[in-house]
């Protein structure tokens, strides 16, 4: 039985007619964590945005296929893509605080987000949110629910963003540089929480990062990008411990901030 939940097949992405992603292929199984690594500008974020229709008016997948289960995402109408985005593929951004509405409480935003995908009462939404907050070891769930984003720390906003992305229990989570704006202690907490999601729900995760330490702590497989091209792709142990390409070896020179011992 084919367990692939997401497949990129020879994908090329262009902006203004110029290709920036070249012939990239990878697949993701249920519960797998893929680390997408490379320097800034290598095309990491562009790759995941293509799957959820966030390339903007100038961006276009010009070759290849992106399949969720057996469905080619590129062939479906925008209305159907919106159903996949959030309900089937959740997203966490680098700065969750910036993506949250500053004039609505976290609780209000959770309720509105869930209403976009399912019929649910405010009470039911709060119950589900509080349950997930507790599973992710939030110390003061009620305070988070009642707070505006500006009343929370950057780290707490990021953790709330993870919870919001997961409340519909999407099978796939895209995490775009989720730890880069955080100090090391909060990085560890966020990594633990994403690993906890995999443990609780079998969530498959694509994490975009330039931090090799985060990749070592989380990933089962690793894809290294440079200038929109695949440099290496394989198991985390093989790519990180026995890199074949000089570019990968250069990336690994940085001392990792996190170790695999944070895996839950």
Regions found by a protein language model. Name each.
Residues 37-39:
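The feature captures the beta-strand-to-loop junction immediately N-terminal to the Walker
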Residues 167-171:
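A short, proline-enriched helix->beta-strand linker immediately N-terminal to the Walker B motif
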Residues 215-217:
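A short, surface-exposed alpha-helical micro-motif characterized by mixed small hydrophobic
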């Amino acid at each position: 039985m084919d367990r692939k939940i997401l497949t990129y097949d020879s994908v090329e992405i262009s902006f203004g007619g110029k290709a920036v992603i070249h012939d990239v292929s990878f697949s993701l199984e249920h519960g797998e964590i893929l680390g997408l690594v490379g320097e800034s500008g290598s095309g990491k974020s562009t790759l995941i945005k293509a799957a959820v229709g966030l390339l903007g008016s100038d961006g276009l997948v010009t070759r290849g296929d992106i399949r969720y289960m057996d469905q080619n995402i590129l062939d479906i109408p925008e209305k159907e893509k919106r159903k996949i985005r959030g309900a089937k593929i959740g997203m966490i951004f680098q700065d969750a605080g910036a993506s949250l509405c500053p004039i609505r409480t976290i609780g209000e935003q959770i309720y509105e987000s869930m209403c976009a995908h399912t019929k649910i009462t405010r009470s039911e939404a709060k119950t589900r949110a509080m349950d997930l907050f507790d599973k992710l070891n939030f110390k003061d769930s009620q305070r988070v629910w009642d707070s505006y984003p500006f009343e929370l720390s950057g780290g707490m906003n990021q953790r709330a963003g993870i919870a919001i992305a997961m409340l519909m229990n999407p099978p796939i989570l895209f995490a775009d540089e989720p730890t880069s704006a955080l100090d090391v202690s909060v990085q560890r907490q966020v990594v633990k929480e994403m690993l906890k999601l995999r443990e609780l729900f079998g969530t498959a995760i694509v994490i975009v990062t330039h931090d090799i330490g985060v990749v070592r702590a989380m990933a089962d497989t690793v894809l290294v990008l440079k200038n929109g091209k695949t440099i290496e792709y394989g198991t985390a142990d093989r790519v990180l411990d026995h890199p074949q390409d000089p570019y990968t070896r250069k990336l690994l020179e940085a001392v990792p901030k996190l170790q695999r011992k944070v895996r839950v």
